[in-house]
Amino acid sequence: MAAITASMVAELRAKTDAPMMECKKALTEADGDMAKAEELLRVKLGNKASKAASRVTAEGVVASFVGANAGALVELNCETDFVAKNDDFNAFAKTVAELVATQNPADVAALSALPLDGKTVDEVRLALVGKIGENISIRRFVRFETSNKLATYLHGSRIGVIVEYTGEQEQVGKDVAMHVAAMKPVSLSSDDVPAELIEKERRVAEQKAAESGKPAEIVAKMVDGSVQKFLKEVSLLNQPFVKNDKQTIEQMLKASNAAVQKFALFVVGEGIEKRQDDFAAEVAAQVAAAKQQ
């Protein structure tokens, strides 16, 4: 049996990015043969990535990038908030955001196939899954290409906003982006609110108004009033400006001789059902997984 030295473990870790203990185990299994140990690790990390792929990713980060004429937001998901703070995970998210802005992929599949450091983006992702031990997924991205100005705002790493705007004052773009993160409008103007949201609000308003017992014509006016109130509340231009609620966003923009063309808002895990296991079930699952290895 060949002696496994610390320098051998360090060399294998540098080649594979695998955890120290995994490197030592692989070298021991390979009887000190570096090439064989590297192959064993790559197979093992690949298996690790495959096992992780079925697990829910409801945590993560939003990353942004703005270049000369394009900007992007990317949501990268993982399983725990601990990994969401990992330096390698965050560096990958920022790199992916830059790729979206500069390479203009059509969708996540096209993004995953882009070259990155001699591999594809997906191969780098899988290597990171193997290294960290959690499932990692690129959930979505948005890209704005324009000759206008772009502003981004990240609230921590869980909320991200990108805004396309015109105007001389850069602070206006930053303020609008921050406002979007705080107030979470669903559209630029009331005309842009999705029809399904309006219909849902109308049904709720009709049910409430019907309970009032008032005449039909009064009920109809109550419903219309509720819907109009809803449209103002969820459209950016009609919302009171978060830094000065005596002005709407539209009024603030007009006073600044500025205009917003569009915006996008990402909130990490929005719409993803996060699995809640009890402690006993979690322990049982870990024991079962250990028996299969």
Curated annotation (Swiss-Prot):
Q: Does the keyword rRNA-binding apply?
A: no
Q: Which keywords does UniProt give here?
A: Cytoplasm, Elongation factor, Protein biosynthesis
Where is the protein localized? Cytoplasm
Q: Which GO terms describe its cellular component?
A: cytoplasm
Q: Which domain of life is it from?
A: Bacteria
- Keyword Cytoplasm belongs to the record: yes
Q: In this UniProt entry, which cysteines form S-S bonds?
A: none
Region of interest (Involved in Mg(2+) ion dislocation from EF-Tu), residue spans: 80-83
For this UniProt entry, the molecular function terms from Gene Ontology, in alphabetical order, are: translation elongation factor activity
The membrane spanning regions, by residue number, are: none
Pfam (any one): EF_TS
Cite the InterPro entries for this sequence: EF-Ts_dimer_sf, Transl_elong_EFTs/EF1B, Transl_elong_EFTs/EF1B_dimer, Transl_elong_Ts_CS, UBA-like_sf
Where primarily located?
A: cytoplasm
Q: Which NCBIfam families match?
A: tsf
* Protein family: Belongs to the EF-Ts family.
What this chain does, per the record? Associates with the EF-Tu.GDP complex and induces the exchange of GDP to GTP. It remains bound to the aminoacyl-tRNA.EF-Tu.GTP complex up to the GTP hydrolysis stage on the ribosome.
Please state what the protein is called.
Elongation factor Ts
Q: What phylogenetic lineage does the species belong to?
A: Bacteria, Pseudomonadati, Pseudomonadota, Betaproteobacteria, Burkholderiales
